[in-house]
Amino acid sequence: MSHNPIRPWRNIERRKSRQVRVGNLMVGGDAPIAVQTMTNTPTEDAAATIAQILRCAEAGADIVRVSCPTEESTKAMREIVKASPVPLVADIHFHYKRGIEAADAGAACLRINPGNIGSHARVKEVVAAARANGCSMRIGVNGGSLERHLLEKYGEPCPDAMVESALDHARILDDLGFYDYKISVKASDMFLTVAAYHALAEATDAPLHLGITEAGGLRTGTVKSSIGMGALLWAGIGDTIRVSLSAEPEEEVKVGFEMLKSLGLRTRGVNIVACPSCARQGFDVIRTVETLEKRLAHISEPISLSIIGCVVNGPGEASLTDLGFTGGGKESGKMFVNGRADHNVANADMVEHIVKLVEDKAARLKAQRDAEEATEVPAE
């Protein structure tokens, strides 16, 4: 739950779901909402895939999905799994044997698509491999690849068809005594996706993986995903997310975290509050923010920073952030620390000064967190 006793209108009551394990990560229940992305390198090229996974992990990815379309790709998974610092989900379509091979290779989770995985007997074999290797599974329904009998029944992809597909396959896993699974019901149609997830959330306690599939490029995909997934997250629905963009996977991770940060569901990195700028600005706000976003991208500790061009809203915004800079002086501005006006800084020195303040604060926060973790008593 995102709980704010002072501002209760910001509270989000998360849907109660059961927990499943994805490698060393717990998903569902009261676990943090996990941010996922997917590699786009040929999986057979282990070196390129590992390099991309490492970049995604550096950006903050909790889970990375890897497509396994060929026997060569599942062979490469052994090397990839060993080198990955985060749990890997093997993406399986059409060829159920790839799921068995991926489980044997060390994948933490198997994603299967009910629309193309095949018969009950094939699913049973995949489940046996998952159980034997400690894998969880994801039932990944997609509006673009629904089973033929459901399309004939409903006429087109619709919420009822997607939920029926998901629950039919959930029952197969339940009947096999396998409960370590999460479910997704994605479509490129935002309205269809949101409606399907709301219906699914009422019908199961399985963790739900959110996404608007084939959302588009960096700008359009971010907007569409933020509206659709943001509405679901605000309603308390969702245990893992993936922002599907026609962009590098690291960008998906960044957008995913910004979405969660905006809703108060996760905190990571610097949250910059900035004005759009106008004629009153005392410095170039747009260029300054662009520079700071790049210079502070390596910070993982949660820090809020306001960059406001003038004194109309600057002091008020700065009073709500850890650090803040407000323009208004002659080629200078006021630096706020912990919500209070602290000192003046020349515009020419502002970026370097802010970067140092943020890095120093991040170092203190990390040292404090490390000390707290070192003194924690292990659970019996």
Curated annotation (Swiss-Prot):
Pathway: Isoprenoid biosynthesis; isopentenyl diphosphate biosynthesis via DXP pathway; isopentenyl diphosphate from 1-deoxy-D-xylulose 5-phosphate: step 5/6
One protein family per Pfam: GcpE
MF terms (GO), sorted A to Z: 4 iron, 4 sulfur cluster binding; 4-hydroxy-3-methylbut-2-en-1-yl diphosphate synthase activity (ferredoxin); 4-hydroxy-3-methylbut-2-enyl-diphosphate synthase activity (flavodoxin); iron ion binding
Coiled coil (UniProt feature): none
SUPFAM superfamilies: FMN-linked oxidoreductases, Nitrite and sulphite reductase 4Fe-4S domain-like
Matching InterPro entries: Dihydropteroate_synth-like_sf (IPR011005), IspG_bac (IPR016425), IspG_bac-typ (IPR004588), NO2/SO3_Rdtase_4Fe4S_sf (IPR045854)
UniProt keyword Repeat present: no
Binding site for [4Fe-4S] cluster: 275, 278, 310, 317
The reaction(s) this protein catalyses: (2E)-4-hydroxy-3-methylbut-2-enyl diphosphate + oxidized [flavodoxin] + H2O + 2 H(+) = 2-C-methyl-D-erythritol 2,4-cyclic diphosphate + reduced [flavodoxin]
Keywords: 4Fe-4S, Iron, Iron-sulfur, Isoprene biosynthesis, Metal-binding, Oxidoreductase
Cofactor(s) needed by this chain: [4Fe-4S] cluster
Keyword Magnesium in annotation: no
Domain of life: Bacteria
Entry's Gene Ontology BP terms: isopentenyl diphosphate biosynthetic process, methylerythritol 4-phosphate pathway; terpenoid biosynthetic process
PANTHER family: 4-HYDROXY-3-METHYLBUT-2-EN-1-YL DIPHOSPHATE SYNTHASE (PTHR30454), 4-HYDROXY-3-METHYLBUT-2-EN-1-YL DIPHOSPHATE SYNTHASE (FERREDOXIN), CHLOROPLASTIC (PTHR30454:SF0)
Xref: NCBIfam families: ispG_gcpE, PRK00366.1
Function: Converts 2C-methyl-D-erythritol 2,4-cyclodiphosphate (ME-2,4cPP) into 1-hydroxy-2-methyl-2-(E)-butenyl 4-diphosphate.
Family (UniProt): Belongs to the IspG family.
Protein name, UniProt field: 4-hydroxy-3-methylbut-2-en-1-yl diphosphate synthase (flavodoxin)
Organism from which the protein derives: Hyphomonas neptunium (strain ATCC 15444)
Gene name of this polypeptide: ispG
